[in-house]
């Protein structure tokens, strides 16, 4: 997004890396004008979107460590690290995005693969965070549900084809599709 928003200029961490990977100065200068800025930023945030890289690999038995060639670390869900919790969630990320880019935002995916009650709680949490940030001045245009009609095999990121159906706001296993608790909660929020 920095590249499209015209922020990758001399001194930006990606500038030298892109130049070393064959991006020409003219190409980067053209992008630096900001003319490729998107009109709206699509913002996806899941409970496990925020990650924590910890060099103390011994604290995470059973978690396979990773490496960048210089450092050994584990990549865990930040939400599982208690001391980070006050800094986590959709609100702080929406605020960061708005403050960094000043481009209108649409929260384009709100979903949590779990019980209906937890899905409603998560949707309400994201909706409330968007409303809070809107009141603080962020231009947040929309909060959308994902997936409206559910997904097949998405929990494996389509790496397996086992026909697992996860219900969305509407359950398509009935005709016509039946609104779920999440759809009803979203309709109530929309009405205010």
Predicted features along the sequence, with ranges:
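Active-site region of glycoside hydrolase catalytic domains
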Residues: 1-124, 128-192
